[in-house]
A protein has these predicted regions:
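Acidic/polar low-complexity flexible segments
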Residues: 1-9, 96-102, 159, 171-203
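Ser/Thr- (and often Asn-) enriched beta-sheet segments in non-cytosolic proteins
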Residues: 6-8, 14-22, 56, 127, ...
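Short helix-loop boundary/capping segments
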Residues: 109-161
Length: 203
């Protein structure tokens, strides 16, 4: 199955993916972090089920496109040591602060909100590998992005693989122009693994 960025996911069911992570779009920005650790001080703590594999960004004249590949069960969350760990929301930095926009992933609504630091919180306060915000509540609602979350149907390290895809109209992000930088961050409520990307708008 190919995601929006033309990446064909394939795995042999063991430790790592057996495919090329490179997107087909020449303008796409992406970062790959396909690894995990059983040790608390190395991401992804807790093993493969908390691994965030990759993040992508691209745009056209009308929309910004983002995709995340993870072994973390999204949007259902992971039951871990007596607690349900929830997916985080997608945080965006467009020059107004480290989290000046957010997209609701945990509730699977795709709600886009203009946020500030006080709107963000950590959704799971126990079993955390790192302190820091993961989800938002409040802010100023702008509209809804197109959000598609699906099970890619492949197994890596004994756990499924999930793809989170977002398409958001550029006007919802205050019409960024060519060369403008967008910072992206996604994690889960315990921050056992965190992935970041600085992308740029092309045209």
């Amino acid at each position: 199955q190919s995601d929006w960025f033309g990446v064909d996911l394939a795995a042999d069911g063991s430790r790592s993916f057996s495919h090329d992570w490179t997107p087909t779009s020449a303008t796409a920005d992406y970062f790959i972090d396909d690894n995990w650790s059983a040790h608390f001080l190395r991401p992804a703590h807790g093993g493969e089920q908390f691994d965030v594999e990759a993040i992508y960004f691209d745009n056209d004249a009308s929309n910004a496109y983002m995709a995340i590949v993870t072994s973390f069960n999204t949007p259902g969350g992971v039951f871990y040591l007596g607690d349900v760990i929830h997916p985080g929301d997608l945080a965006m930095d467009l020059g107004g602060g480290s989290r000046d926009y957010g997209i609701d992933v945990d509730g699977a609504t795709g709600l886009v909100a203009d946020t500030d630091a006080g709107d963000w919180y950590q959704s799971n306060a126990i079993f955390l590998a790192e302190n820091g915000p993961t989800n938002f509540s409040g802010g100023t609602s702008i509209g809804n992005a197109s959000l598609d979350i699906y099970d890619a149907g492949i197994v890596e390290g004994g756990y499924g693989t999930y793809v989170i895809e977002v398409s958001v109209p550029r006007w919802m992000l205050n019409d960024p122009g060519a060369g403008d930088i967008i910072g992206l961050e996604w994690t889960m409520g315990c921050r056992n693994d965190v992935i970041n990307l600085d992308g740029s708008f092309d045209g």
